[in-house]
Every structure is written in structure tokens, then in C-alpha cells.
Amino acid sequence: IKRELIPAYVAEKGWSKWWSKARTKIKRDSHYGFSEKKKDLIFTRDKPVTFAEELLESFSTSDSFSKKLDFAIEFVNNIEKEEGLSVVPYFIDYFTEEMKGDSETRQVLSYMILKDMAKFVDPSKLKLDALRQKVVDFIKGSHDLALLSMKISSYDYKKDLVNIIEESREDWPHVLSELLFETPVRIHKYILNNLIRSHSYSIINGFIDRVITGAKQYPDIFIWVARNLLSKQWDYDWLDYSRERLAVTGFRLMNE
């Protein structure tokens, strides 16, 4: 598709943005579908199928929790309330059952997607308050929240996790500082802004010191930190680090 449209109809530099919007519109058209084997192959359906029905079919035939979650997120993000009313109970039933399982990771993610499903049904029927409390109780006692965050691929759900940690734990600045060692760098700016807002300057300086000291162990995080410090994106009076040490560590890392 890209080869056929560029540059006659779409500029090369604008392709990604244009195709993202076009792909969503095509998915919502009941007369067209995307091949599961070839990502950008579009076919005409013999019988119209709504996008909601297609997502439910993919959801139902998948054995993977993570894939089911991806289909559910796509459902929430792209399906209007009226179209989704007849389909959403299947999603809700599955994730409600997952809330009863032994996997804390699945429980946290199931709560988050069920919370988003509230746009289709009466929130009280989902018993979200009770589900949230179950998640909060787990987060209050967990020592592996950095590992949990690594298992969450959705940026919005990572953000939800950060917010729940902040609301649930007195030591949240320390807990969130551990999440800053996660790669790739995605939720980090949001976490850092929250730490700055709460004046957790010693936590931030401690994080920077650990990154410089452990640059070999955290090369991607070191590059992110160094770029922000050297470009003065982070330009605060309370920052306490050695610029010389930062530069020397960077040179050593590049020469290894």
C-alpha cells in the first residue's frame, strides 16, 4: 500500500500519521478487513462484519491473555457505545473471571480494562470500587512493582499504575524511582514530573547518581539522563551531580 501511494497521494514524511488514521477508518468499515497473515493486505468481505464483531472473534479465538487484552483495548479505543453494547459482555465476563485468578499482574490489568469498559455499561454493575481495592491492597504490600510495570505494554496502563502507586503508598517516591530503571524509556517523563511536583529532589538526585555509577548496567537509562542533563532540559537549582563525572562516564561507555 505504501509503495502505491507514495509520493503520488501521500508525502513520505506524513505517511505514518496518515496511515494510522486511514487504517482506523478502514477497520471500522464492515465491508473491508485486514489479513492476519499480511499486515497491510486489505480484502473485501463477502458478508459485512462490524469492527466490534471482528475484534470479538479475534478475542475469542486467542489463547493468550496479553493478546486478549490488546483486542480489548482496541475495542475500547475504537468502538462507539451503541455498536459495542451487544459485544462488551463477552469481554467483561472474561476479565471479571481473571480478577479471581492467582496472577496479580492479570488482576491489575483486568481491573484497568474493566474500568475502561465502564463507558459501555453502568459502572456499578462492574463493582469497580471492590476491584480497585483488591488492586490497591496488592500494590500496598508488593515489593515487585518495577517488575509489574515492565509487564505492562500499554502507556496508559503504565500511567494508571503510577497513579495508583502514588495514591496507595506513603513511600511512593522511592517506589517510582525504581520504575525509572525500566527500558525502553516511555513512562519516565511522567514519573519524573510527579517526583518534581512532590519536591522529591533527594530521590531524583539519588537516581541520577545510581545511573552514572551503574552506566554499564543501565546504558539506555544513562543516555536518557545524560541527554537531558547536558542539553539542560533538566535545569534545576536543586540538581546535585558532577558534570565532569557524567561526561567521563559517557566517554568510557562509548569507547567500550
What kind of feature is each model-predicted range?
Residues I1:
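Non-catalytic nucleic-acid-binding interfaces of large nucleic-acid enzymes and RNP effectors
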Residues E4-G14:
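Short helix-coil junctions and helix-kink-helix linkers
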Residues S20-E57:
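Charged low-complexity interaction tracts in eukaryotic proteins
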Residues E53-D63, I208, I212-Q217:
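Amphipathic alpha-helical assembly segments used for oligomerization, scaffolding, or translocation
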Residues L55-G84:
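Leucine-rich, amphipathic alpha-helical/linker segments
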Residues G101-D102:
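Flexible helix-coil transition and linker loops at the boundaries of alpha-helical arrays
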